[in-house]
């Protein structure tokens, strides 16, 4: 993304060279083989899955062959999301790699462009899990957390709801945000 946004920066040539070396069908085939080994169904779920979809979405904005090379891996992770989301009874709200809101935020844009069924599934699950959330307690951050579960949820809902619906949802979810409360956020 940096190379796309700032093509004149000194590091751009090195970024393109690294992409040319790494984002090739042979290397993706190795990743797919690793992913398909027995017992790997949950490998990197959901954080790694989502980051790969975000990477593929960015690569699709470039003229190079990288998006086509990475697409089989993106499709494999999308298939895993399709299978996983209906099984997840409750959202995973921790502030770590397992946070489902953060993962779905990353996957949402990719799904909108590349997999309408997954896009609809992400939006439906987000509404199912979070639409009725009110007066968030925001007992965070935890000692081992690097994400704010509350803010990750809010970011996802900002992508799923239209502007007016999100404003109403956010006002109910964090009703004292304008006063800087909860202070941990």
Regions found by a protein language model. Name each.
Residues 2, 19, 59, 126-129, ...:
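Alpha-helical solenoid scaffolds that mediate protein-protein interactions
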Residues 135, 170-185:
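Non-catalytic carbohydrate-binding regions of carbohydrate-active enzymes
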Residues 80-151:
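Loop-centered beta-sheet repeat module
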Residues 2-107:
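Extended ligand-binding groove/face enriched in aromatic
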Residues 4, 58-61, 109-113, 128, ...:
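Positions within ordered alpha-helical repeat solenoids
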Residues 27-31, 149-153, 157, 163:
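Carbohydrate-active enzyme catalytic cores, enriched for enzymes
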